[in-house]
Regions:
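Amphipathic alpha-helical packing segments from all-alpha helical-bundle domains
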Residues: 62, 83, 93-100, 109-135, ...
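Short, Lys/Arg-enriched anionic-surface-contact patches
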Residues: 1-3
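Solvent-exposed, amphipathic alpha-helical segments
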Residues: 6, 10-18, 64-68, 101, ...
């Protein structure tokens, strides 16, 4: 029997590939080669699955990244910021999922609340890191917002900004803000 996480991972793959309308019980059971009984063993209908899917997205693509950066509590803000940038840049294929969740959030209230929570958590963490930088020519909160909007914009333009160009944008922004080469 597939685990709850197997169902959620399959849901994220479908969401990234084809958008929220593709995430149906029929598609999921077909993708996993399982019965609807297995699905209902883990979730109380479509609403329960979609709630769990949004929570899974948040856990994997926000909470997990922050927790990974915070594994070294003695690291200074600069080291943590660089580590976060490296983690974000390591998953360029994640952009399709980010785009799909944002598109879903435009049409669904629950997805919108989840996206707002994700954006708020991410920007609050970036603000915390930017406030801890030794020196910045840009106000810390503004720098945090700028770094986040670079990522969102890079994912949304067509074609999306390639990972190496996104890395260069981050490196230039951090160099302009701190006077140091961090990436």
């Amino acid at each position: 029997m597939a685990s709850r996480v197997d169902w959620l991972d399959a849901g994220l793959r479908l969401l990234a590939a084809e958008g929220a309308p593709a995430v149906t019980i029929e598609r999921l059971t077909s993708e996993l080669g399982l019965s609807k009984g297995s699905y209902y063993h883990h979730f109380q209908g479509v609403g329960g699955f979609r709630t769990a899917l949004l929570e899974h997205f948040e856990a994997l693509f926000t909470t997990r990244l922050i927790d990974t950066v915070e594994e070294d509590p003695g690291a200074d803000a600069e080291v943590k910021l660089v580590r976060l940038m490296e983690l974000v840049l390591a998953g360029p294929e994640d952009a399709k999922l980010e785009i799909a969740v944002r598109a879903w959030a435009l049409q669904d209230g629950e997805a919108r609340q989840a996206q707002e929570r994700v954006d708020r958590t991410r920007t609050q963490y970036l603000r915390k890191l930017c406030r801890g930088l030794e020196s910045s020519l840009i106000a810390p909160d503004r720098l945090a917002e700028l770094l986040y909007l670079i990522l969102i914009g890079a994912e949304q333009v067509l074609p999306p900004v390639p990972a190496d160009e996104l890395r260069a944008l981050y490196a230039d922004t951090l160099r302009l803000a701190t006077g140091k080469s961090l990436l």
